[in-house]
Amino acid sequence: MSLENKNIIITAGGTGGHIYPALAIAELLRQNKANVTWVGTPNSMEASIVPEYFNIQFIKSSGVRRKGIIKKITFPLKLAYNTLKSRSLLKKLKADLVIGFGGYVSGPICLAAAQINIPVIIHEQNAKIGLTNRILAKFATTICLAFEIENLHKQFSSKQLAKTKIVGNPVRKDIVALNDKARIYTDSSTLKILVLGGSQGAKAINEIIPKLIQKSNEQGINIKVWHQTGKLSLEETKDAYKDISQNHIKDIAAFIDDMAIAYNWADLVICRAGALTVSECAIAGLPAIFIPLPSAVDDHQFFNAQNIVNNNAGFCLRQQQMTLENLLAIIKPLNQDRSKLEQMSKMAKKTLIKNSSEQILDCVKKILNNK
């Protein structure tokens, strides 16, 4: 069916892990002639990213997890107020359907939609269902998951399970295109490692990588690194590289503008295990060493990595396990036998769904066709 003149609301915010999958869907909806409006919170990441691409409306919203007693007491009142404001906004926008990708802003918008009989799709990017989506699952028309969730039958009712689909994480087209490209691991003397700390950086990873390169050189392993530090650690990390030859450094930057180029360049990635990073590495067929963020809610980054690890397409080290000895124990055999990297690349591509965006689009069309 055509989506022409259909008013679809995207709500997502807080982190890139929520925002970038939502952007991929929003773009596909626009290509299918839908009218797309984004709802986010002011003074947020989405407020700085989304306006370049889509019309965005704002409501104030905040979470309750790990907050003080006063905020926990006032939270229900604020949620009720924001939900009421969201109802007015949805009526003003003449919304036909709402898609929530997580973040606190999704709560009041999706609740408001359900209250006034507007269909709701929610998408969970992580291998652990977040608090907002656990609540919204009761009201959603369709529940989309990126990963198989352990013991989901204990978290969802039979009615909720019946409306649940595993669709993967939407990623950008230029990264999906890497899925069709075979990675060739030659007997090159250089092992190219991409290091990603996430948009805010990862201090522990940033500190150990320069030491890893020095130690590797001592053991005859020639590493070249492309290191994304995050904005907070750029100068400090650059200083840690000052005694390392430029022959071992492709670039050290706070951000990488074109991730498809970076993924295509690398033989191996060392990174956190945010949902989007895990999905992009898998789709790009890039073997990975995942270092889950220790403070991640419900340890979700550890669980995000497990599908790839269990399929022999990557490794996972807890941050306290991220020693030079453990990293070298992984890297040295891969450097000596590049066919292991090639096999890991093939397995990585099989672990995730690459047509996630199209599957979510299909959900949208089915719901609106039956509306």
UniProtKB/Swiss-Prot annotation:
Pfam family name, one: Glyco_transf_28
Gene Ontology biological process terms from the UniProt entry: carbohydrate metabolic process; cell division; cell wall organization; lipid glycosylation; peptidoglycan biosynthetic process; regulation of cell shape
GO cellular component: plasma membrane
Bilayer topology annotation: Peripheral membrane protein
UniProt xrefs under InterPro entries: GlcNAc_MurG, Glyco_trans_28_C, GlycoTrans_28_N
Pathway in which the depicted protein is active: Cell wall biogenesis; peptidoglycan biosynthesis
Domain of life: Bacteria
Reactions mediated catalytically: di-trans,octa-cis-undecaprenyl diphospho-N-acetyl-alpha-D-muramoyl-L-alanyl-D-glutamyl-meso-2,6-diaminopimeloyl-D-alanyl-D-alanine + UDP-N-acetyl-alpha-D-glucosamine = di-trans,octa-cis-undecaprenyl diphospho-[N-acetyl-alpha-D-glucosaminyl-(1->4)]-N-acetyl-alpha-D-muramoyl-L-alanyl-D-glutamyl-meso-2,6-diaminopimeloyl-D-alanyl-D-alanine + UDP + H(+)
Subcellular location: Cell inner membrane
Any one Gene Ontology molecular-function term assigned to this protein's record: undecaprenyldiphospho-muramoylpentapeptide beta-N-acetylglucosaminyltransferase activity
Signal peptide coordinates: none
Enzyme Commission number(s) of this protein: 2.4.1.227
Physiological role: Cell wall formation. Catalyzes the transfer of a GlcNAc subunit on undecaprenyl-pyrophosphoryl-MurNAc-pentapeptide (lipid intermediate I) to form undecaprenyl-pyrophosphoryl-MurNAc-(pentapeptide)GlcNAc (lipid intermediate II).
Family (UniProt): Belongs to the glycosyltransferase 28 family. MurG subfamily.
HAMAP family: MurG
Protein's name according to its UniProt entry: UDP-N-acetylglucosamine--N-acetylmuramyl-(pentapeptide) pyrophosphoryl-undecaprenol N-acetylglucosamine transferase
Gene: murG
